[in-house]
Amino acid sequence: MLIQRGGLKVVAGLGISGVSAVNFLHEQGYQVAVTDSRPTPPGHDQIPAGVKTSFGQLDQELLLQAEEIILSPGLAPQLPEIQAAIAKGISVVGDIQLLRRATDVPIVAITGSNAKSTVTTLIGLMAKDAGKKVAVGGNLGRPALDLLKDQPELLVLELSSFQLETTSHLNAEVAVVLNMSEDHLDRHGNMLGYHQAKHRIFQGAKKVVFNRDDALSRPLVPDTTPMQSFGLNAPDLNQYGVLRDADGTLWLARGLQRLIKSSDLYIQGMHNVANALACLALGEAIGLPMESMLETLKRFKGLEHRCEYVKTVRDVRYYNDSKGTNVGATLAAIDGLGAAIEVKKGKVALILGGQGKGQDFSPLRSSIEKYAKVVVLIGEDAPVIEQAIQGATKILHAATLKEAVELCQRETQAEDVVLLSPACASFDMFKSYNDRGQQFVACVNSLV
């Protein structure tokens, strides 16, 4: 029989992190209850016996009995039921706060509007390859509290603005906001609210990494906090950046020291150069050897369906960016790959289309004009996209993804890149963006 400790802990909102919090608190011997507005929330069957449940609405009465409320990231603190509890002086936290209380293992904390998952995965691999017992998760993969079961010596956490809203004094070993662009404004009210939520990651941080190309990523921290920057320009002493040789060769660099050519990476594009530099700075902050980090970087092929290198066929590289389901993501992929191959006069053959979700596709125009030799359109919104980009470059149509890949092969030559980055949802032709990406990989593998 577990000893009951302290007052009642009420978990509001189930889902992956809610279930994780309930189980963690129950194992710690706390009196736990859980409430969710859904009648049968996901994970309701994974709640241990002895935990009181109240489903179908957020149980105001139960929340007001709590000593502390653990809020799932999907629920906004602004909800009236939560505000009523706050007005009564009841503490409201999230699973990341519980994690910080439960362990003093060093944390590498990562947030940003884009690239969080790539950087979190890569720095996790760098730490593992350097011999660290590391656990990786948070907003990506495994919920944060579950990571403690591994008894790690280092935690690498991807954190969303929703998770950071209910976290204070994370006291990370090193923290970074990779970049900031408009996102989740429906939840945070405006850009300032979003910015404030993201920057909670720096509270109590021992070291800080920031993106000097993005002023909004730079924190207000005490002058005594060690800070290191990364950016896509020539770096100052001890900072990370890029150096260019006279022949156009691009190097990732620390100060004046050239570390690795961008062409030696599987992950291509300037956005990925920035991600790699961020990882090197984070790795340095936790004492990972440079040699080992560069080895990991050379082998890293990126995340599945996110500008993922597939293979080279007849000196043409193929990339799967099926996760590019909106115009912003596809722009980053075109600009990133286009700028990287421009040095060798390479061009992009782009596969676009699917369900457009009412988006405006005209922002793609100038990048397509600059970097694409051909666009092959697929899916139900092909006519809408064609209208938006008409005249920017050569446009072809394909009835299937297989036909699109074959057309791209016909249109390309050595040093070119074929990129699937549809800027659309996939449900007109595929089960999901995963399915679309897997079919693309299969089509590429069948080329000769």
Swiss-Prot record:
Residues that, per the record, bind ATP: G112, S113, N114, A115, K116, S117, T118
The organism's place on the tree of life at top rank: Bacteria
Enzyme Commission numbers on file: 6.3.2.9
UniProt keyword terms in alphabetical order: ATP-binding, Cell cycle, Cell division, Cell shape, Cell wall biogenesis/degradation, Cytoplasm, Ligase, Nucleotide-binding, Peptidoglycan synthesis
GO MF terms, alphabetically ordered: ATP binding; UDP-N-acetylmuramoylalanine-D-glutamate ligase activity
GO biological process: cell division; cell wall organization; peptidoglycan biosynthetic process; regulation of cell shape
Keyword Cell division appears in the UniProt entry: yes
Any GO CC annotation of this UniProt entry: cytoplasm
UniProt key word Cytoplasm: yes
Catalytic activity reported: UDP-N-acetyl-alpha-D-muramoyl-L-alanine + D-glutamate + ATP = UDP-N-acetyl-alpha-D-muramoyl-L-alanyl-D-glutamate + ADP + phosphate + H(+)
Pathway: Cell wall biogenesis; peptidoglycan biosynthesis
Subcellular location: Cytoplasm
Function (record text): Cell wall formation. Catalyzes the addition of glutamate to the nucleotide precursor UDP-N-acetylmuramoyl-L-alanine (UMA).
Family: Belongs to the MurCDEF family.
Name of the featured protein: UDP-N-acetylmuramoylalanine--D-glutamate ligase
Annotated organism of origin: Acinetobacter baumannii (strain ACICU)
